A protein has these predicted regions:
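Cross-family detector of peptidyl-prolyl cis-trans isomerase
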Residues: 1-148
Length: 148
């Protein structure tokens, strides 16, 4: 997957494709099987500036942070420093309390949950604008853990 579309950014609750580090993945290709859900935090001027600088580094003047993005990051939160570097493909529309519980599960030395956390059901709400291929919003439902 190609990284970064300006219409969709790393606000709280977005789903994005993970990827290997730049040193082993210089083309920044996204994983087809791993993703993350943005928790992030409400951003101040310093956090927004970090996001702006990253966009400038990646895209020059061809892609900038909009006023809508800034306001969303200030009021809802997110991770603006990831914009343009990872592919955002969906959004949690309900169940962020469950996502926060997942964030707090016990993890091993590789930052992986000690017990698997599985999303059993995701609901397609609508196609997301701006994508050539069909991309969808997803609703995260109650996670189920199983012993390894």
């Amino acid at each position: 997957m190609a990284a970064g579309l300006p219409q969709i950014f790393h606000k709280r609750g977005t789903l994005a494709a993970a990827r290997e580090p730049d040193i082993v993945n210089p083309m920044h290709e996204s994983s087809s099987s791993q993703f993350y859900i943005v928790i992030g935090k409400k951003q101040d001027d310093k956090g927004l500036e970090r996001g702006r600088k990253n966009l400038q580094k990646l895209f020059g003047d061809s892609l900038t942070m909009t006023k809508e993005m800034e306001e969303t990051y200030r009021t809802i939160g997110g991770t603006p420093h990831l914009d343009g570097a990872y592919t955002v493909f969906g959004e949690v529309t309900e169940g962020m309390d469950v996502v926060e519980k997942i964030q707090n599960v016990k993890r091993d030395e590789y930052d992986r949950p000690v017990e698997d956390v599985r999303i059993i059901k995701a609901t397609i709400l609508k196609d997301m604008p701006g994508y050539e291929k069909k991309q969808v919003k997803r609703t995260v439902k109650k996670p189920v853990r199983r012993k390894r």
